[in-house]
Amino acid sequence: MRVKLADVCERGSSNLKQADIPGKSGDYPVYGASGYIGNVDFYQQKKPYVAVVKDGAGIGRAMLLPAESSVIGTMQYLLPKSVVLPEYLFYVVKHMHLEKYFSGATIPHIYFKDYQNEEFTLDDLNKQHEVVTTLRKVESVIENRQQQLQKLDDLIKARFVEMFGDPGTNPMGWKETTIGEECFYIK
């Protein structure tokens, strides 16, 4: 069934400032637009939730965050109602491209009132579990492939150095010259 975002979650806000976090300690994590910031001795959300960057760089980016944690004021809580799994809500919001709702030239902002009417298909809870499981597997495959590509890139660089040596130190003793001295132009 098609529903609006506002039908399946409640909006929440935080008054925490990033400057207040360093030097504090505790068991409960605090997150910002770039991820984990530090721990404090309290939390603002008891259950898992979705946080959306609402101010500054990265606006519209969604994060799935754990129970007993908090976010700073540049983030906004999307607290799932009982009809939606937090993970399902995360994937839905992640693919809504909320950045299209930004306003403000110097510091961009997005407001829940602007994107609360975004529609999506809400499946029953069993189907949501299936969708989340499938998407986790797909993300895992993508992550593994990215790691493989990075390792292949490292291998190519290592092979180049093995064949030609390090261009900075020239351990092979290659003659140093210019392209103009070694090549000629054919028209």
Model-identified regions with their sequence ranges:
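Non-catalytic DNA-recognition/assembly elements of restriction-modification systems
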Residues: 1-16, 20-32, 119-133, 144-187
